[in-house]
Amino acid sequence: LIPVTHTSANGLPLGSEADHSYRKILFFDCGLMLRLLGITTGDTTTLATQILTSTAADLVNKGTIAELVVGLEMLHYMPPNLRHELYYWVRLSKNSLAEIDYLLPSHLQILPIEVKAGSQGGMKSLWSFMREKHLTEAIRCSLENFGSFSHTDKEDRDTARHVSVIPLYAVSQIIKITTSDRV
């Protein structure tokens, strides 16, 4: 089991504001998770592949499985000389629900990563988090092809915000982005 720890994400390092009483847990294997969910019909590897390519029947847990795959793949591609910790953010307010699936340090900034199990879905939590934390870059990992979204935030002095889209099959690119040297 791999913990993903809540952080307030007000700056780096992300662990400095970690709240270990709020954690999401990743199973170390998709097949094991599907088995525990009682989804045992046929080959679970094939089922996981179908889920991530949107050819499987619509499952309630599809988003959770996509988050699991992204988390495990990010850990797999992290350089071995770095400490492997995953963080997420959630607004802990009774009247407002917002969550960012993963946060990574990238070039002395926080990089929010939103995971979507399909090719559509709103990004209200992502835009809100970026505004609150004064960030201009983020990643959306989904079934979409490579692409990007730009947004001029009228509520924050017309700040330009940019979201890069990375397909679920290319999660390794996220780690390349966060660890590459900028020119």
Please identify what each model-predicted range represents.
Residues V70, M74, I100-S119, A138:
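Conserved catalytic cores of phosphodiester-cleaving nucleases, focusing on short active-site segments
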